[in-house]
């Protein structure tokens, strides 16, 4: 049994017991979280598609961690002009463990 959920502008295929990193969500560690945008659900035999989402379908989980990803360096350079610019960015994420899929 699996479902496809939408959060943070991205889609994720999830099953019960899965751990995934999504874009930062509000909440504390060990806090409960629900995803209401369930786009697809499959129980192994039947597939249910939403238009765009399945009504009354909820994926429940809890937050494992709030953190930051690896640093990405952005380096701009123009030759012969003495222009150099170095910036860094660390994207925030939320690690979520999926507990149940309810349809």
Swiss-Prot record:
Entries under SUPFAM superfamilies matching the protein: L21p-like (SSF141091)
One of the record's GO molecular function terms: structural constituent of ribosome
Keywords: Ribonucleoprotein, Ribosomal protein, RNA-binding, rRNA-binding
InterPro entries attached to this UniProt entry: bL21-like, bL21-like_sf, Ribosomal_bL21, Ribosomal_bL21_CS
GO cellular component labels: cytoplasm; ribonucleoprotein complex; ribosome
GO biological process, one term: translation
Quaternary organization: Part of the 50S ribosomal subunit. Contacts protein L20.
Family: Belongs to the bacterial ribosomal protein bL21 family.
Function: This protein binds to 23S rRNA in the presence of protein L20.
Name of the protein this chain belongs to: Large ribosomal subunit protein bL21
Organism: Desulforapulum autotrophicum (strain ATCC 43914 / DSM 3382 / VKM B-1955 / HRM2) (Desulfobacterium autotrophicum)
Name of the gene: rplU
């Amino acid at each position: 049994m699996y479902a496809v959920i939408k959060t943070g502008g991205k889609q994720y295929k999830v099953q019960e017991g899965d751990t995934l990193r999504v874009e930062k969500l509000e909440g504390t560690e060990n806090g409960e979280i629900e995803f209401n945008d369930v786009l697809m659900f499959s129980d192994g035999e039947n597939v249910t598609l939403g238009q765009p989402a399945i009504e009354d379908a909820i994926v429940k989980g809890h937050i494992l961690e709030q953190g930051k990803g690896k640093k990405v360096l952005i380096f701009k350079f123009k030759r012969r002009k003495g222009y150099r610019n170095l910036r860094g960015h660390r994207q925030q994420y939320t690690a979520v463990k999926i507990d149940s899929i309810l349809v």
